[in-house]
């Protein structure tokens, strides 16, 4: 007999959902009402799995598998996008789950025996994912022996006549292991997490052979610190030897010529590797302080790396903030060329009464009352400052983007530290009069480089009064960068137009992960002085909000 609806003295309570927090997060990230895959929601799922571990990787993969095969194309596309984020951010625990035979069979369950003339969107994404796994973790991961079923599925599909799409180099680079130096504690933590994930899967299987393997693994885990101490030291020595070879090559490239080509990609990559590894030396020395020989070698190598970084920066003309070697000859005022948040000091010249004789480029961005923030979606507006992502909080936060803290006559001096870091291209203009055709060569320059973020740009001249910039954003750290946004200001009397960024997330150690095109109108060929741009970058990494800012001088072309 069906239960009647009637009023009672008991309070009405909403029935509790039987779904776990993880499943709710996955459903939210893959719901069909989304216009496109939401990277923020996908990363939220990845962070949840990394924090919980245990059975969550398997639970997530099973939920994604059901969404892929439920018949809803849009939900399947979102589920595969989520799976891609998990594979790239959750490590071995997810890699072990996608290598299970049951998962791979269900993933291709809707593939016909004979390949169709044209693949569906879901089939195309599945083939691309399997090819990406095959080219990266199945070949280069230290645990590649645990991923044999992915190799088998790749061979089977190829035998059936399926063709795999070409995977972009940036996607392959994310999953390939990097050569970054790691401390013993980091190596131990990584190994323990991998062993715990494997033990979880072996116990869940319950097969006799798997239980025997689980018994061996538990013995290894119980005596991990003693049994694998030699292996950990060997891994550290291998990584140090790789770094020493890089340091020798870097030193040779810096000393092989009187004026080394610092724009060379190999030199920049070696510099980035050594710079990111140098802070780890202190941790290694602290953790291995009982090993006198290793500590001595590390101290000597650390001194060598610091000297190489100093030499590179002295050639490049960069400030040595990370190495704590300030330039004592430079006025303190010039060290703070741009400050988006600090109040104006008493020594700062007043901006309310500029001289009448100032030219537009002398009074750089001086008329603050007319400055506004604009979105890159409407580049036709003549706004001087552009908020690349059009964030609402950027437009109302009251930040004074255009306080350069310098008088017009000091513009050249105040930019000396920054302009020295830019190599002025020669022969960019090949014209004897304004009526002749302007030709420009594209050369990459470094706008800024920090511990996490590197910004490069290529500068060309499109017309007698217009410059074009192609800006590249790279992540030089081992942690992903999310919610990336940039604010840029150009001089008064010019018009800065920006196209939208190609994205707002940078995977770890990704080069040119985001690209953007900008143009500055109103820069005459005969100006005769460099133009400076003011910028501020905001992003998140490892859960912390970061902010970088500065001023750069564009080469005269």
Swiss-Prot record:
<feature type="modified residue" description="Phosphoserine">
    <location>
        <position position="357"/>
    </location>
</feature>
<feature type="modified residue" description="Phosphoserine">
    <location>
        <position position="378"/>
    </location>
</feature>
<dbReference type="InterPro" id="IPR002014">
    <property type="entry name" value="VHS_dom"/>
</dbReference>
<keyword id="KW-0175">Coiled coil</keyword>
<dbReference type="Pfam" id="PF00790">
    <property type="entry name" value="VHS"/>
</dbReference>
<feature type="domain" description="GAT">
    <location>
        <begin position="192"/>
        <end position="317"/>
    </location>
</feature>
<dbReference type="InterPro" id="IPR038425">
    <property type="entry name" value="GAT_sf"/>
</dbReference>
<dbReference type="InterPro" id="IPR004152">
    <property type="entry name" value="GAT_dom"/>
</dbReference>
<comment type="function">
    <text>May play a role in the regulation of membrane traffic through the trans-Golgi network.</text>
</comment>
<dbReference type="GO" id="GO:0043328">
    <property type="term" value="P:protein transport to vacuole involved in ubiquitin-dependent protein catabolic process via the multivesicular body sorting pathway"/>
</dbReference>
<dbReference type="InterPro" id="IPR008152">
    <property type="entry name" value="Clathrin_a/b/g-adaptin_app_Ig"/>
</dbReference>
<dbReference type="GO" id="GO:0043130">
    <property type="term" value="F:ubiquitin binding"/>
</dbReference>
<dbReference type="InterPro" id="IPR008942">
    <property type="entry name" value="ENTH_VHS"/>
</dbReference>
<dbReference type="InterPro" id="IPR013041">
    <property type="entry name" value="Clathrin_app_Ig-like_sf"/>
</dbReference>
<feature type="domain" description="VHS">
    <location>
        <begin position="29"/>
        <end position="165"/>
    </location>
</feature>
<feature type="modified residue" description="Phosphoserine">
    <location>
        <position position="353"/>
    </location>
</feature>
<dbReference type="InterPro" id="IPR008153">
    <property type="entry name" value="GAE_dom"/>
</dbReference>
<feature type="modified residue" description="Phosphothreonine">
    <location>
        <position position="348"/>
    </location>
</feature>
<dbReference type="GO" id="GO:0006896">
    <property type="term" value="P:Golgi to vacuole transport"/>
</dbReference>
<feature type="modified residue" description="Phosphoserine">
    <location>
        <position position="394"/>
    </location>
</feature>
<keyword id="KW-0333">Golgi apparatus</keyword>
<dbReference type="Pfam" id="PF02883">
    <property type="entry name" value="Alpha_adaptinC2"/>
</dbReference>
<feature type="domain" description="GAE">
    <location>
        <begin position="440"/>
        <end position="556"/>
    </location>
</feature>
<dbReference type="GO" id="GO:0005829">
    <property type="term" value="C:cytosol"/>
</dbReference>
<dbReference type="InterPro" id="IPR052653">
    <property type="entry name" value="ARF-binding"/>
</dbReference>
<keyword id="KW-0597">Phosphoprotein</keyword>
<dbReference type="GO" id="GO:0035091">
    <property type="term" value="F:phosphatidylinositol binding"/>
</dbReference>
<keyword id="KW-0813">Transport</keyword>
<dbReference type="InterPro" id="IPR041198">
    <property type="entry name" value="GGA_N-GAT"/>
</dbReference>
<dbReference type="Pfam" id="PF18308">
    <property type="entry name" value="GGA_N-GAT"/>
</dbReference>
<keyword id="KW-0653">Protein transport</keyword>
<protein>
    <recommendedName>
        <fullName>ADP-ribosylation factor-binding protein GGA1</fullName>
    </recommendedName>
</protein>
<dbReference type="Pfam" id="PF03127">
    <property type="entry name" value="GAT"/>
</dbReference>
<comment type="subunit">
    <text>Binds to ARF1 and ARF2.</text>
</comment>
<dbReference type="GO" id="GO:0005802">
    <property type="term" value="C:trans-Golgi network"/>
</dbReference>
<dbReference type="GO" id="GO:0006895">
    <property type="term" value="P:Golgi to endosome transport"/>
</dbReference>
